[in-house]
Amino acid sequence: MPLYDDNTDRQTTPYINYLFIALNIFVFVLFQDFGENDRFTYTFSTVPQEIISGHDIQTEPSVLGHSRSGEQIVMPGLEKTPIPVYLTMITSMFMHGSFGHIIGNMLFLWIFGDNIEDKLGHLRYLIFYLLSGIAASLAHVGTCYFLNTSLLIPSLGASGAISGVMGAYVFFFPHRNVTVLILRFTTTVPAFFAVGLWFVLQIISSTALLDGKEGGGVAYGAHIGGFLAGIPIGFILDSWGKPKNPSRDWTPPV
């Protein structure tokens, strides 16, 4: 697990990255009630079938089974979405299902996001993050459609957008030192190893989907799609606005 990276050459304060972290925490605490507000969560999460059809879908709660104490385990139904369904690909980026979910995501965003913002600048980083998250959501929807699974199960979390951040990170800073925790020990490895290993694990874990399994509630398609999308999106935005021929702006000294 990554703990921190080398930021000695960072030149700007990552205001947008801080904003994203604060916004995720704000939504989780005040709107999701620490993950307990199922109605809000099911209203603004991304539902693959809604994205495919372009229409809002509402369903009744369903009983999944019973607990050891005999109580029913009920899965909430899909709620009416007060916004166009395609906008849920943005709202879902700022929602999480549990403490572990948001803590893990915010740790990764804290470690890797500031470097991408420093590289792209504040506005381009904001655009990059949102585009990566949307690309990840589309990858998840495509995976669900292709495998004909989880089409009515809401997906949420910043993981897809953060996967895009990690893709851009390993593209721009492949040899940046990242300190990772392995069992009880810490060691420093280059980014291409730390992030590359994470990506390989996502691919390996995603093979469970091919066997008809649900993947443990993890949207591996979003992780893989976000990671792969983050590289070209980052490259294009980094090139955006730069002079095509910098030599033309050069003037000889007097």
Annotate each PLM feature.
Residues 1-254:
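A detector for small-residue-rich transmembrane helices and their helix-helix packing motifs
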